[in-house]
């Protein structure tokens, strides 16, 4: 494989995010990179892809900047680009937690756990493991025994914690996310909320899966990623599928977006059921006049109406 996908972040001061984003986009395009990068006054959060040569040049360029000299890059080999375009966008935050009283992870954050230390935490009955990701990420794969917050956006996590605080009373709390950036701020928020014993998986799931000692042990399913790959393997010890098809509940690890552009819900679905149910999550979405699956596959009105009856069969067997 001649391509690489880079996942990285750094909490650091960027005085002029708008100008930085403009200059950074020009640099990335000049080096034929593709991806999505967020920048703010609090730092940078990015995922991008390119050839090994191009990504090595990018990492060298970033490490030459005093602000990013010790930034850690998580690297995956790939067969091609993981993105279709290159975006660098200035934002208020590099992860959207939207706190009234913001947390600076450079000053307040949970204890860092190495992959080996995190594995011990997974084995400890007195430790609560919280998945800091969204529900659709959890449903594709997660650490065994982890708590699933019922959220679709990271910014909803603090409210969920407040509503379920009794679950964590007098327990050690350990949190994890994809690459570590969400936990840097979330674990700091937990400390400010009065939780005394708070830790986080340093480097996230991505680092844990590559650790030569843990080898991704106790991870079930696949890890959701925010690029064209959709998911990647983590557990090198054993293979399990925990995702379930949206329609029939059978084991499934294939995510699609609902074909209704006004819905766009992410669902796990087999190719067979995607065809059967017109790429939609519901009857209402399947019959939507701008159904993308219908348009992309040039399905006639008669065939469209015929396949809509599949939802009748679905309800009869529910």
Swiss-Prot record:
Q: Which domain of life is it from?
A: Bacteria
Record-annotated membrane-spanning stretches: none
Source species, please?
Answer: Staphylococcus aureus (strain MSSA476)
UniProt keyword annotation of Oxidoreductase present:
yes
User: What region holds the Rhodanese domain?
Assistant: 123-217
Which PANTHER family did the record assign? RHODANESE-LIKE DOMAIN-CONTAINING PROTEIN 7-RELATED, THIOSULFATE SULFURTRANSFERASE/RHODANESE-LIKE DOMAIN-CONTAINING PROTEIN 2
Q: Which Gene Ontology molecular function entries are recorded, alphabetically?
A: oxidoreductase activity, acting on paired donors, with incorporation or reduction of molecular oxygen
N-terminal signal peptide: none
The answer to keyword ATP-binding applying to this record is: no
Q: Which reaction does it catalyse?
A: uridine(34) in tRNA + AH2 + O2 = 5-hydroxyuridine(34) in tRNA + A + H2O
Keywords, A to Z, come to: Oxidoreductase, tRNA processing
InterPro entries for this protein: Rhodanese-like_dom, Rhodanese-like_dom_sf, Rhodanese_C, TrhO, TRHO_N
Q: What is the lineage of its organism?
A: Bacteria, Bacillati, Bacillota, Bacilli, Bacillales
Q: What protein name does the entry list?
A: tRNA uridine(34) hydroxylase
Q: Which Gene Ontology BP annotations are present? A: tRNA modification
What's this chain's function? Catalyzes oxygen-dependent 5-hydroxyuridine (ho5U) modification at position 34 in tRNAs.
């Amino acid at each position: 494989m001649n391509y690489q996908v880079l996942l990285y972040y750094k909490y650091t001061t960027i005085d002029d995010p708008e100008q930085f984003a403009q200059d950074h986009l020009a640099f990335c395009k000049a080096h034929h990179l593709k991806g999505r990068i967020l920048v703010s006054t609090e730092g940078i959060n990015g995922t991008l892809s390119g050839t090994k040569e191009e990504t090595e040049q990018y990492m060298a360029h970033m490490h030459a900047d005093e602000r990013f000299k010790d930034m850690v890059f998580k690297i995956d080999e790939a067969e091609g680009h993981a993105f279709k375009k290159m975006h660098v966008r200035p934002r208020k935050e590099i992860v959207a937690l939207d706190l009234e009283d913001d947390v600076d992870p450079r000053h307040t954050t949970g204890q860092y756990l190495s992959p080996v230390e995190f594995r011990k935490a997974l084995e400890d009955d007195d430790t609560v493991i919280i998945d800091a990701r969204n529900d659709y990420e959890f449903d594709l794969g997660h650490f065994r025994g982890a708590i699933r917050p019922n959220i679709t956006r990271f910014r909803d996590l603090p409210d969920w914690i407040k509503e379920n605080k009794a679950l964590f009373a007098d327990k050690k709390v350990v949190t994890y996310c994809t690459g570590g950036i969400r936990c840097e701020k979330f674990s700091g928020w937990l400390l400010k909320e009065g939780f005394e014993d708070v830790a986080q998986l340093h480097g996230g799931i991505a680092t844990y899966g590559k650790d030569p000692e843990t080898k991704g042990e106790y991870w079930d399913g696949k890890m959701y990623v925010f690029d064209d790959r959709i998911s990647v393997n983590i557990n090198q010890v054993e293979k399990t599928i925990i995702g379930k098809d949206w329609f029939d509940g059978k084991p499934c690890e294939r995510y699609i977006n609902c074909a209704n552009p006004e819905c766009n819900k992410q669902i796990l679905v087999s190719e067979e059921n995607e065809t059967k149910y017109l790429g939609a999550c519901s009857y209402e979405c399947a019959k939507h006049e701008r159904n993308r699956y219908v348009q992309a596959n040039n399905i006639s009105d008669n065939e469209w109406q015929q396949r809509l009856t599949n939802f009748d069969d679905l309800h009869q067997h529910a």
